């Protein structure tokens, strides 16, 4: 693959030279990327920028690049789920490391710094609403990384085996994987965040132990997650993207991690729908930390 042009069927480039889903050009992308699920939140981030050079949207993918405290930053929405992360991470890496004219990898690798800001449900009774949880480790229930050949080279196999035993993991489920976030980002953010081991679920309801009208395969999911502890880590929260983000970044040679605002506590069954002021504070603090 490294010596042959990537076929157009595998990497689709639009007529205007932009990458297929994100619809942005290689020159549109900054080295520092702040990602979030909600396209509308990108506009809120942009209000904090000093300057704005571009604003593009395609489907759920909203991109604004500008400057913050003298540094170029891209704010980008990824939509919901690890399947979207597979698209976004592949296309971000292509923008950074594939020559769109020759369709060959560039001689010099460009390393991106990617922070995802999201919301989550806390999985421990002692984590209060409003906490900022940094995913040191992510647990993928989604199976996305199992489709990439080198995935096992980054998996934390001791964690995985202990977790499968503890959960009595159903054989019909995709095998869970554990992956560590960027040490560089962890070092920058660990002073003001909760040390997290985060579950990325392939859905919001059943896969996170929520039952509305359908019975669950694992009705005691939250209780089982609360009880898992390994090498000083416990399951802190549940969301839907961090595992694929951290894993694909490691495989592709980028730095990535997720910080989530806890807007619900699944154990004590509390939630805070009025979380937007806290989210704004998180976005501002994240920008300050990324650009420091």
Positions of predicted regions on the chain:
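A short, acidic, amphipathic alpha-helical segment used as a generic capping/interface helix at domain edges
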Residues: 222-232, 238, 242-248
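His/Asp/Glu-rich mid-to-C-terminal helical/loop segments that flank catalytic regions of hydrolases
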Residues: 265-292
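Glycine-rich beta-alpha junction loops
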Residues: 121, 138, 199-206, 244, ...
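Active-site rim beta-loop-alpha module in soluble metabolic enzymes
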Residues: 158-230
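Intrinsically disordered, low-complexity segments enriched in small residues
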Residues: 21-26, 202-208, 280-288
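Generic structural signal for well-ordered, non-membrane alpha-helical segments
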Residues: 35, 39-42, 78-85, 89, ...
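Metabolite-binding pocket within alpha/beta catalytic cores that recognizes anionic/polar moieties
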Residues: 2-177
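Zn-dependent metallopeptidase/amidohydrolase metal-coordination segment
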Residues: 243-275
């Amino acid at each position: 693959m490294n010596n042959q042009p990537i076929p157009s069927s595998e990497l689709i480039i639009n007529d205007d030279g932009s990458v297929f889903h994100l619809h942005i050009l290689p020159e549109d992308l900054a080295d520092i990327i702040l990602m979030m699920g909600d396209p509308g939140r990108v506009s809120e981030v942009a209000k904090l920028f000093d300057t704005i050079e571009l604003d593009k949207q395609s489907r759920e993918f909203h991109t604004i690049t500008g400057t913050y405290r003298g540094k170029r930053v891209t704010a980008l929405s990824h939509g919901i789920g690890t399947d979207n992360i597979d698209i976004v991470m592949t296309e971000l890496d292509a923008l950074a490391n594939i020559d769109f004219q020759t369709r060959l990898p560039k001689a010099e690798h460009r390393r991106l710094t990617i922070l995802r800001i999201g919301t989550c449900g806390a999985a421990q009774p002692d984590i209060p609403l409003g906490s900022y949880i940094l995913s040191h480790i992510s647990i993928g229930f989604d199976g996305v990384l199992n489709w990439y050949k080198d995935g096992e080279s980054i998996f934390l196999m001791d964690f995985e085996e202990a977790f499968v035993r503890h959960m009595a993991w159903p054989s019909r489920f995709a095998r869970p994987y554990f992956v560590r976030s960027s040490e560089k980002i962890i070092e920058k953010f660990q002073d003001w965040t909760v040390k997290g081991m985060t579950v990325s679920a392939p859905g919001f309801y059943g896969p996170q132990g929520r039952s509305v009208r359908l019975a669950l395969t694992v009705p005691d999911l939250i209780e089982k997650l609360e009880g898992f502890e390994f090498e000083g880590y416990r399951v802190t929260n549940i969301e839907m993207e961090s595992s694929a983000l951290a894993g694909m970044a490691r495989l592709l040679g980028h730095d990535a991690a997720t910080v989530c605002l806890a807007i619900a506590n699944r154990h004590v069954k509390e939630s805070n729908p009025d979380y937007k002021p806290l989210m704004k504070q998180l976005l501002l603090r994240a920008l300050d930390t990324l650009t420091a």
